[in-house]
Amino acid sequence: MGSLSTLNLIKTCVTLASSEKLNQPSQCYTISTCMKSSNNPPFNYYQINGRKKMSTAIDSSVNAPPEQKYNSTALEHDTEIIEIEDHIECIRRLLRTAGDGRISVSPYDTAWIALIKDLDGHDSPQFPSSMEWVADNQLPDGSWGDEHFVCVYDRLVNTIACVVALRSWNVHAHKCEKGIKYIKENVHKLEDANEEHMTCGFEVVFPALLQRAQSMGIKGIPYNAPVIEEIYNSREKKLKRIPMEVVHKVATSLLFSLEGLENLEWEKLLKLQSPDGSFLTSPSSTAFAFIHTKDRKCFNFINNIVHTFKGGAPHTYPVDIFGRLWAVDRLQRLGISRFFESEIAEFLSHVHRFWSDEAGVFSGRESVFCDIDDTSMGLRLLRMHGYHVDPNVLKNFKQSDKFSCYGGQMMECSSPIYNLYRASQLQFPGEEILEEANKFAYKFLQEKLESNQILDKWLISNHLSDEIKVGLEMPWYATLPRVETSYYIHHYGGGDDVWIGKTLYRMPEISNDTYRELARLDFRRCQAQHQLEWIYMQRWYESCRMQEFGISRKEVLRAYFLASGTIFEVERAKERVAWARSQIISHMIKSFFNKETTSSDQKQALLTELLFGNISASETEKRELDGVVVATLRQFLEGFDIGTRHQVKAAWDVWLRKVEQGEAHGGADAELCTTTLNTCANQHLSSHPDYNTLSKLTNKICHKLSQIQHQKEMKGGIKAKCSINNKEVDIEMQWLVKLVLEKSGLNRKAKQAFLSIAKTYYYRAYYADQTMDAHIFKVLFEPVV
């Protein structure tokens, strides 16, 4: 093969980067380009891995590639490594000081707090710092709201609230006039605004503020504009959906917008107050309640917020559950969660303390109201980390055959249903509610995509539709961690993401540019290590004469990709390469046995030598193919230390016996691979009863998936449809997921190896070759920018 540097390879294939369709890679892209030998190191090898000479690295690692230690002294002065360490430390500080959650200030809620009169009877605000915050944070155009993103709903509801607060105390008249002018000149924009981006409760609270402004004699606002009449009509429709007798008895979403309601019976409503004194964690709703009731718990809640935010108030608080769940989700999907294992464990322990199998969770702890978004995310992450949670909690959000974020919602949107879909994929056997949720969510999201109606009610993100599209095309069983990360790094909005509540808001623990930058740096670092290992794999391929066994370079690349797409960490090079090589060596042996020219005597002689011979170094001198097999396996085993080598050799002996008996199918290969992985990771647990149960189930699943893959290949695997329609396999996968995720006496990492192997078999059976080739390029060769 000719020489081609990785840098040139990237330039050749870079047009694929613009193709987001999983099943339609760029026309100029061919996987064979990526398989050409490279005598040059990866483009950033010296930046990432110190300045070791390439020839030395290759020569010393044909059998066991060197691990590029994260904390190696040789890397201390490397710019990217220092940057990675700085980002990790910055994020650790952020996570360790999460408290009740970080969230931006809402002018609207701050204005409502500023309306509270002095408790001692003076004609002044009880919280002058809130009044000062309002006065100090008007934008140059006269409005209040998110400085960097213009949403007319957000700007208008914030501005009318701040104008009312300023006029109530007869201060800053010029600021009032600028605000009134902004409302007058921009209220017509509501006619063409995206309804999906309407702030929460806008149709309830905006008319109420207009009425208050009009009763105060504030002139210049077009109170009778047609668009305002439409908003009043929307208000009436919403209030009819949730009758007032229900509002006074049950915790509904209207508790979040009490300031927009009339004729309230406060004695009844105070019974629905949250333990922290708030009404559904809303400062504005709670401020309105305090104005009418002088309830001490309401006051304490407001006082704490004003102190915490130095006069300001967010639209909701606390956000400890929401912030923790979404932070963990982002860190996991960005592929950087391994740097923050203790912080993630603490986050999920906190969430679990406030989880209810009867109700679920809300954005803030101890809420009397829950929603499907937080509950779905909590269900998925808690289950994934070994906590017992009951998915039947989702029945609270199901009416007839539909799921909704919460009762009374007028318009269902994409992001909560997408989180429901993701949670539904961690189904255990017999969990019908998750089966129903999966079918509903997939259909709902597919229809949204097809009709291009993916704008969301809760999140403004440039790549949300792409994220959902990829999520539907990549079911969890068939998703490799590095493939998911390669897409999500592009889809993740970082600090540009804007959340929609009563006003627009930002969440630093969720939408964070430092997360994204660390993910990019880490991905590049891992990718450079993988590219280096691929060079070793190609040298190994040639030196072991694999082409003579009918094994193509493409097959070796795919085997290595499955390993590196799952075990991607730089420090796990030994496990990753052992996985890939064990798959190829087993293929070599089966290829030798399946050759028509191989006699029975030759087969038996090779088996005897592999099983009982010493497999000494002198065998490398043999020129026949059986000698190559012996030498290759010897070389592989010598890459392990003596104790580990004994364990791996025992696994190979078991597999070779199955070859002898004609039972070396996909399940046997999976067992060999899993044992090798766990042995490399010093997980010597094969005598544990749970280990044997997992092994048998994984073997069974992988055998069936191998048959499905073979059938698809016979029908034309290159462009075959990406799907698996086998109910039996799916049920067995549910059992495997249950055994792996539920806590037991078996080490979690050892159990995870079984699921990882099974998912690679599912991946191969699910995707067409063309799609797999696109993933290979994206994970191993496409630059991350």
From Swiss-Prot:
Gene assigned in the entry: CPS3
Protein name: (+)-copalyl diphosphate synthase 3, chloroplastic
Primary site of residence: plastid
Coiled-coil blocks: none
Function, in words: Involved in the biosynthesis of labdane-type diterpenoid including marrubiin and other labdane-related furanoid diterpenoids with potential applications as anti-diabetics, analgesics or vasorelaxants. Terpene synthase that produces (+)-copalyl diphosphate ((+)-CPP) from geranylgeranyl diphosphate (GGPP).
Family statement drawn from the similarity comment of this UniProt entry: Belongs to the terpene synthase family.
Reactions listed under catalytic activity: (2E,6E,10E)-geranylgeranyl diphosphate = (+)-copalyl diphosphate
Cofactor(s) needed for function: Mg(2+)
Keywords assigned: Chloroplast, Isomerase, Magnesium, Metal-binding, Plastid, Transit peptide
Source organism superkingdom: Eukaryota
UniProt binding sites for Mg(2+): 371, 373
Species classification: Eukaryota, Viridiplantae, Streptophyta, Embryophyta, Tracheophyta
Pathway: Secondary metabolite biosynthesis; terpenoid biosynthesis
Cell compartments where the protein resides: Plastid, Chloroplast
Domain notes per entry: The Asp-Xaa-Asp-Asp (DXDD) motif is important for the catalytic activity, presumably through binding to Mg(2+).
